[in-house]
Amino acid sequence: MIGLIGRKVGMTRVFTEEGVSIPVTVVEVEANRVSQVKTLETDGYAAIQVTAGSKKANRVNKAEAGHFAKAGVEAGRGLWEFRLENGEEFEVGAELTVELFNETKKVDVTGTSKGKGFQGAVKRWNFRTQDMTHGNSLSHRAPGSIGQCQTPGRVFKGKKMAGHMGAERVTTQNLEIVRVDAERNLLLIKGAVPGATGGNVIVKPAVKA
């Protein structure tokens, strides 16, 4: 399913003709350039590789420089892949713009969530706190028991405990596209999308639409 790589600009609001305020996230989509076309014969699956934005020449290593030169496209800030469905065809060097979503109403947006550092179980996993009084003096935000006794005699993998929170890949599904601004290469998406301002986001047609 083909999508676009964008950059989260921030949030604002737009008004409908009835005067209703809609909170929107602005996503800037610089032209996505196709840097490679993968086929069943050569790669075992069909996909396109795209790059977006630009990168300083002194930040492009030799492997990247050769790859982009072969494709005849400007070096971008990263490489992403989109799987192709039957019958879809693209050429190396082709550009994908926001007009791809002119007929799309709902999208899934993937980004890297804001990093929040080391957090306890209450903030990280929404554990309820223990009693604030009634003899409790040190364990207000402690997680409580983390297992049983001699059997099994260990803590199970995946146990929800304190640890690093955020800075992970997150997808928010079924967000509504409020406006497609082809002139300024902007997508206005209703509500919040994952990640910090300036972060890369992947916008795809919604799978559950």
Curated annotation (Swiss-Prot):
This is Large ribosomal subunit protein uL3. GO terms for molecular function: rRNA binding; structural constituent of ribosome. The keyword Membrane does not apply. Keywords: Methylation, Ribonucleoprotein, Ribosomal protein, RNA-binding, rRNA-binding. Part of the 50S ribosomal subunit. Forms a cluster with proteins L14 and L19. It comes from Vibrio parahaemolyticus serotype O3:K6 (strain RIMD 2210633). Coiled coil: none annotated. Belongs to the universal ribosomal protein uL3 family. One of the primary rRNA binding proteins, it binds directly near the 3'-end of the 23S rRNA, where it nucleates assembly of the 50S subunit. The lineage of its organism: Bacteria, Pseudomonadati, Pseudomonadota, Gammaproteobacteria, Vibrionales. InterPro entries: Ribosomal_uL3 (IPR000597), Ribosomal_uL3_bac/org-type (IPR019927), Ribosomal_uL3_CS (IPR019926), Transl_B-barrel_sf (IPR009000). The modification N5-methylglutamine is found at residue 150.
